[in-house]
Design a protein with these regions (language model features):
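Histidine-acidic metal/acid-base catalytic patches
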Residues: 1-4, 11-28, 51, 58-60, ...
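A generic structural signal for short
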Residues: 6-7, 41-42, 79-80, 120-121, ...
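Active-site-proximal loop/turn and secondary-structure-junction residues that shape catalytic pockets
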Residues: 9-11, 34-36, 71-73, 111-115, ...
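Structural motif corresponding to the early beta-alpha repeats
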Residues: 28, 32-127, 142, 233, ...
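Conserved beta-alpha-beta core of the PfkB/ribokinase-like small-molecule kinase fold
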Residues: 145-146, 173
Length: 283
């Protein structure tokens, strides 16, 4: 496994600066973030900018395992839905343009909806992801579902249902376990259940159970990374363990992405040592 950091923590910072920050702290991978208000907008980024980003990645030695690019395909307004779908597909096209030696990164996106809508909306959600998976198959890109507390796909069984319902190798899982943790789930159960679908992960810390929960910087809560990392490795995962900093943290008045990135690095590398897990460098 490799230790990564998500540009979600600093998505409006120039992309070269994102890469420089993550590389300078010792991480081995970076997740880029593409959206309408981010420094990297998949719908407007030029070929020159893409080449510059790829060059910066190559110079740094950082792996690019993922691009986060969210779009709500449950929107009822046809124009809004069309824009959301176009943004995610543009993210998939960007993944192809930024592909490195190991191929294009996956594209992470959420299912949206509300928990109480799962039964009524699950087929539409599956159809939405099947649509994206077909586009991914054409482009050679994997779409990775991000489960999310407060959304329809908030529990391991629901996540497994939609993954199996779509049944495409181009539709896999971005394993963000924090959302399961604040739902009161036990990683000794959900890791064996879902790891076989995982192509990428997010890691953060958390406190409390939904609805009274808070996402935190790794190390601020009580989550046992030294116990978790060997479990997910034993389950067969060998990709990036990518730190994601929640908007809850970013909204703090003293928020500093470089400081939380450095602190997260120390927390995860220490936990890996205590758990007997080695983060391998990029080949």
């Amino acid at each position: 496994m490799r230790l990564g950091f998500s540009a979600w923590a600093m998505s409006t910072m120039p992309v070269r600066d994102q890469i420089s920050l993550v590389h300078g702290l010792g991480y081995q991978a970076i997740e880029l973030v593409g959206g309408d208000t981010d420094a990297l907008n998949p719908m407007t980024v030029t070929d020159t900018e893409v080449r510059d980003i790829r060059r910066a990645l190559d110079d740094s030695g950082l792996e690019l395992p993922s691009i986060a690019c969210h779009g709500n395909l449950l929107e009822t307004d046809p124009a809004v839905r069309a824009h959301a779908c176009a943004r995610v597909i543009a993210g998939m096209e960007l993944a192809v343009r930024l592909a490195g030696p190991s191929g294009p990164p996956c594209v992470v996106t959420m299912g949206f909806g509300l928990p109480e809508q799962f039964d009524t909306h699950r087929q539409q959600i599956a159809d939405n992801f099947a649509e994206l998976a077909r586009a991914g198959a054409h482009l050679g890109v994997i779409v990775a579902l991000e489960p999310h507390v407060g959304q329809a796909l908030d529990l391991p069984d629901r996540v497994q249902w939609v993954l199996d319902a779509v049944g495409s190798p181009n539709f896999r899982l971005n394993f963000d376990n924090s959302h399961f943790e604040v739902m009161g789930c036990d990683f000794h159960a959900y890791v064996p259940q879902l790891t076989r679908y995982a192509v990428h992960t997010h890691m953060k810390d958390q406190r409390g159970i939904a609805p009274g929960f808070e996402f935190l910087v790794p190390g601020e809560g009580t989550f046992d990374y030294a116990a978790y990392l060997p479990v997910i490795e034993k389950a067969g995962y060998n990709g990036a363990i990518t730190v994601e900093i929640s908007k809850m943290v970013q909204n703090r008045p003293d928020y500093d992405p470089a400081e939380v990135a450095a602190r997260s690095y120390r927390t995860l590398t220490d936990a890996a040592k205590r758990g007997g897990v080695t983060f391998a460098p990029v080949a």
